[in-house]
Amino acid sequence: MLVTFRAIVCVLVAFVLAAGSAINSRAFAADDVAKADAAIEARPAASEAELKYWLENMVRYHGFSVEETAAATGLSLGEVQKNLKAFTIQPESQKGRDSLLLLPWPSGRHPRIGFLEGAILPQRETKVSIFTPWGDHDYVVVDVPEAVWSNLGLTYLAHTHIPTVFDKQGKTLKKLEWNRHADGTLDIERVLPNGIRFGAVVRPKIDHVQMELWLKNGTPELLTDLRVQNCVMLKSASGFNAQTNDNKQSEGPYAIARSANGNRWIITAWEPLHRAWYNDRCPCLHSDPEFPDCKPGQTVRLKGWLSFYEGNDIGSELKRISVSRSE
């Protein structure tokens, strides 16, 4: 059944790509792809405690509907409603928190508005939700990493689109989950079939989120051209999710989105920087870094940042952040 479902998704994507000029047809097919993604990526909870955690994550914090929760958990609508009642879980406003809220992204709701054909089967183990200070259930989804490139080719991709070197070899990566810590920190580690290890650590602070990526070369050869894509998706951030790049800018390592009302900002940065860019179709922000060349047995690291700002002097805020990051 799974193979058949994947085949249907691939047919839909092929139709979308072939119908570039037929905007309405493409939008319809892309919406079907998003629904198929959620069904395939349903992850049943391993225990009652895990079920409660994920229901709280989805409904209390993300504000998921019963339908979205069912898609993410694999439960029926009736089972979702029964468990929400048993655990007394309901949506709660996330405005006015003392510090930023960071949670694993739960799947069930595609993190993009558009260009869905370029992100089939989004994997939840690379994605975190960082909640803005301004909305009841407003958040950005950070894909860390979305993709890792090297001299070997596309070495890792956090969804299905362009085949990776391991896809071409017929090798499948197992599903993982974020490790959750009492202070809100999330971390994860993945081992690739050729021995490369990489991982991410994401730490919530009062007014920003610190991020780190690391990679260890477990191969016998030098790894070069280690470019990384880290994507900040804006679909669920009210005031930032218009499909345009007119509200986006970059300065040094900073990629920045401005709200529709003009005085709220989402700021992200990674160093050392490879390039900053944006995609209006998703919509999303990128501050994409590059690891230094990595010898066999060596570990290399990257540092990242995400914060929110309300005010009219974005230049001064970037200077403040730069000082804070250097301390």
Predicted regions and their residues:
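Extended, loop-rich substrate-binding clefts of extracytoplasmic carbohydrate-active enzymes
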Residues: 154-205
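A contiguous, surface-exposed recognition patch within enzymatic or periplasmic domains that forms
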Residues: 124-126, 132-138, 144-147, 218, ...
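Short, amphipathic alpha-helical "recognition" segments used to contact nucleic acids or chromatin
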Residues: 48-63
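Short Lys/Arg-enriched helix C-cap and helix-to-coil transition segments
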Residues: 91-106
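Acidic (Asp/Glu-rich), glycine- and aromatic
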Residues: 204-244
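Acidic-aromatic substrate-binding/catalytic surfaces of carbohydrate-active enzymes
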Residues: 102-173
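Bacterial N-terminal signal peptides
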Residues: 7-22
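Beta-strand-rich recognition/accessory modules
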Residues: 161-173, 177-180, 260-327
